[in-house]
Amino acid sequence: MCRVFMIAGTHSGAGKTTLSLGIMGVLSKKYNVRPFKVGPDYIDTAYHRYVTRNFSVNLDLFMLGEENLKNLFYKNASRADVSIIEGVMGLYDGIDTTSRGSSAHIAKLVNVPVVLVVDASSMAASVSALIMGYIYYDKDVDIRGVILNKVGSERHYTLLKEVIERDLNIEVFGYLPKDVELELPERHLGLLPVYETENLDKKLEKLYGYIENCIDVEKLMNLTVKPPDFIEKEDRVLKEKKVKIAYAYDEAFNFYYKESLETLEEMGAHLIPFSPLDDERLPEGTEGLYIGGGFPEVFAKRLSENESMLREIKEAVEKGMPVYAECGGLMYLSKGIRDLEGNRYSMVGVYDFEVVMTKKLQRFGYVEAEITMDNVLFKKGERIKGHEFHYSRIEGFSQNASYIVNRPGKEEKWECGFVHKNCLASFVHINLYTYKEGVKRFLDRCSSFGRK
């Protein structure tokens, strides 16, 4: 049996992330906890890793598909003492107006019980009606119990617990009191990243104290499921010589899916982290580059001042080194970044365009793309799925676009996936786990470059 449960909320802001981090952190003191996150979010998963010391796995139905999602879940859950899935938005909120891809959908897909987080502030008997609605909206969702958040006092909790247990045959695992010090700071893309959150350890210690005193975590450990027979597919490529791939990893660039990095390694890559902020040179013997997303706009001044790294990457691209960059990586490879105050910071300059930060969200949500020309990952005619989320736009000439992008079911289309020599940069985030043929092409190009 697998000890596993999902922490889902009645709505965004109910407190599921705070409770997920607290419960993961407390259980990690005694157990090997494997965290998961429904949806494509990078920032929440970084917090998961911080409190559990284990990479978090994204369970995104749109990008992975059902079989890949189930395989990833059971593969990782089978290696842990307990697995905890943090949901996304409200329990039944999925793609567009449906529940497809929602926390509820994923819970049913991988057959796990749900613990519902309820914002109980200023509520009494109404809390039962609210919970009842979530239980009966879809009876196939296995809601085993609730945790009450923003509770006014112990007396308030006692009243709420009595009402719920009187009206509903459901477990009340505990509560969190109202405390503004538990709130994590936010910015334009969601939570402030782990790297930038002040007094995080102090906040977490206070949270852990509440969890240990107010929530029955041992009862949560009794939530189990019988996993299906699982046989892990062997994708590892046995090569005497690994392909050396340097990937940008620091405060400015850290948006990577665990499965993307693992896929690269399984297909023959030797991954070497480097810092565009602090390192002067690329790692010795680098044969290819992977520059993920992040917040280069926040660190634009420091990035622009590291001129030796800017030159190093520009020269490598011009020599034909294969490079794949997503979102923040695209911004870094542009001529420059202009912030909201109009300040301009020079970047690598592989592409002729600049990236301008905007107050208005430019793109948000799932996208599909048709490949219109061969590049280092994809062949013309192939289709890919991903997501975009950025407050920035391109200004200037956009050369050699190899993607035609659209939102599923929408008519609007736009170009992306810009190609220069063996460099591909796009605003679209993808999960490389689903594109192993593309990874093989990329690594083959890198290997060929290394032999020159």
UniProtKB/Swiss-Prot annotation:
Similarity comment: family membership: Belongs to the CobB/CbiA family.
Pathway: Cofactor biosynthesis; adenosylcobalamin biosynthesis; cob(II)yrinate a,c-diamide from sirohydrochlorin (anaerobic route): step 10/10
The species this protein was found in: Caldanaerobacter subterraneus subsp. tengcongensis (strain DSM 15242 / JCM 11007 / NBRC 100824 / MB4) (Thermoanaerobacter tengcongensis)
Site residues by UniProt (Increases nucleophilicity of active site Cys): 429
Keywords: ATP-binding, Cobalamin biosynthesis, Glutamine amidotransferase, Ligase, Magnesium, Nucleotide-binding
Role of this protein: Catalyzes the ATP-dependent amidation of the two carboxylate groups at positions a and c of cobyrinate, using either L-glutamine or ammonia as the nitrogen source.
Protein name from the UniProt record: Cobyrinate a,c-diamide synthase
GO BP field: cobalamin biosynthetic process
Domain commentary: Comprises of two domains. The C-terminal domain contains the binding site for glutamine and catalyzes the hydrolysis of this substrate to glutamate and ammonia. The N-terminal domain is anticipated to bind ATP and cobyrinate and catalyzes the ultimate synthesis of the diamide product. The ammonia produced via the glutaminase domain is probably translocated to the adjacent domain via a molecular tunnel, where it reacts with an activated intermediate.
Gene transcribed to yield this protein: cbiA
Cofactor: Mg(2+)
